[in-house]
Amino acid sequence: MANDKNEDQKEEETKTLQEKYDELLEELDSKNKELAKINEDLEKQKEETQEYISLSQRLQADFENFKKINEKKSKDIIKFANEPLIKNILDSYEDLERALENSKTEKELRDGVELIYSKIKDVLTKEGLEEIPAKGEKFDPFKHEALMVANDENVENGYIIDELMKGYTLKGKVIKYSKVRVCKK
């Protein structure tokens, strides 16, 4: 009986061990499946990461190309910004050349030069150039440059007596100050 009991006990222990072994195998199988899923997800993440890196590199390259193209366009815009003005002045330049070549008398030359002066003035006015009024105006240091001062009984203190050189604005911005003589008493 003791043997039967021992055998029953051994059988029971074996059965319990077998059950634990089976449970552990199931748990191991489950963990292996989880690990396989994690590895699969990790591979997908690696692929996505690589795609993002590749996309980022392409975008960076595209952006660099975009910057280079815009830089070239900007340089071209600056380089050729005066083209319309030059084209307009070229007509007057050629007129001046013809006037010099074809004028027989001083009057013809003067008439030709006056016509050319008028054309150039029109071109510059269309481009936004305006003369700064000076003579008889109150001195304005933002528009005028006083080269001389003088006392003139006919002119109020601080007003311009003479304009020595004309000044100009381009679309409202002073590009050349009028050189003037100012009355100072």
Swiss-Prot record:
The keyword Chaperone applies. GO terms for biological process: protein folding. It is found in: Cytoplasm. Keywords: Chaperone, Cytoplasm, Stress response. InterPro entries: GrpE, GrpE_coiled_coil, GrpE_head. One of its GO terms (cellular component) is cytoplasm. GO terms for molecular function: adenyl-nucleotide exchange factor activity; protein homodimerization activity; protein-folding chaperone binding; unfolded protein binding. It comes from the Archaea. Its main location: cytoplasm. Participates actively in the response to hyperosmotic and heat shock by preventing the aggregation of stress-denatured proteins, in association with DnaK and GrpE. It is the nucleotide exchange factor for DnaK and may function as a thermosensor. Unfolded proteins bind initially to DnaJ; upon interaction with the DnaJ-bound protein, DnaK hydrolyzes its bound ATP, resulting in the formation of a stable complex. GrpE releases ADP from DnaK; ATP binding to DnaK triggers the release of the substrate protein, thus completing the reaction cycle. Belongs to the GrpE family. Homodimer. This is Protein GrpE. It comes from Methanobrevibacter smithii (strain ATCC 35061 / DSM 861 / OCM 144 / PS).
